[in-house]
Amino acid sequence: MKKKAIIILIIIIFVAIAIGTIIVKKSNNNVAQDGIQKIKMSEVTRSVFYAPQYVAINNGYFKDDGIEIELTTGQGADAVMTSVLSGESQIGFAGPEASIYVYNEGKEDYTQVFAQLTKRDGSFLVSKEKNDNFNWSNLKGKTVIPGRKGGVPYMTLEYVIKQKGLNSKTDLRLDDSIKFDLMASAFTSGTADYVTLFEPTASNIQKLGKGYIVASVGKEAGEIPYTAYFAKKSYIQNNEKMIQEFTNAIYKGQKWVKEHTAKEIAEAIQSFFPDTDLDLLTTAIQSYKDIDAWNETPVLKEESFNKLQDVISEAGELKQKAPYDKIVNNNYAYNACK
């Protein structure tokens, strides 16, 4: 009996060790054998608009701090947020409005924004007809494809339209039935007069002679925190070192982009746009330099955050404003800039 009890005890010990090993492996499943931490990040779309991010990846700024980015494209802020909340991705990259909505829903482990990349809308208004003397009043009686209703591209355009003295409901038609990734093809093959497109798509449409860039939505709307990085509050608290290193890499990318020419940036990020030639990529990047699209630091200012909420409120998509200090955690951005 004694021998049998010892055997049972030994079996129990081995089982406990095996379970413990599995738990440890699971908790470290994002850490490779070489010490590199793999981070799954979901970006809202693939665009030249996010050049500082791609520079940070290709220039090795993340790897310098022991981070390997596994990048996926969510095609929409909703999809990105779902990926983060489900744990499929650790970091999301989309508009801060997604975090505002989640907070207002009363979710306990809501997401916090810890670094800002772009500081204005990155879309350009593209016309079917060439118009060297475009005026926003030209939109009267026309059909525009602005993206999904409730999305920031839609709301920012609507904000500009109102600022220009037009009524978005009676003076023109905003066709919000087209999915974000189908807007360009719907415009070139359909009857809409205008569409809002990001680069390099906008410049490519113009190069093909299927449309003409007539205005920058972001230049007209002014500064708002258009795209930023966020993660669940609990994840940030439990991974402060990684979040700091991630933010440091983004800041290095922002500085590099500021200090280099459009062509140099195009050469640095071309691997992310294999179907776009270097000249077109350079043109697209210059468009963003011309409108001062990128934040110089990862810090998200309260003034621009409040303006974003004003834009959303005017569109009727925000029942109550969220507190800046709940949604935004600038600690890591400030540290990166030291």
Q: Which residues does each PLM region occupy?
A:
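Short, low-complexity disordered leader/linker segments with a strong preference
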Residues: 1-38, 336-338
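Short, glycine-/small- and polar/acidic-enriched structural segments
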Residues: 32-169, 173-177, 186, 193-199, ...
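Predominant activation on well-ordered alpha-helical scaffold segments within soluble catalytic domains
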Residues: 54, 100, 158, 203, ...
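Soluble non-cytosolic domains of exported or imported proteins
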Residues: 74-78, 93, 147, 151-155, ...
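Pocket-lining segment of extracytoplasmic ligand-binding domains
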Residues: 98, 107, 179-273
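Secondary-structure end/capping motifs
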Residues: 237-319
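Conserved C-terminal helix/tail region of periplasmic/extracytoplasmic solute-binding proteins
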Residues: 306-338
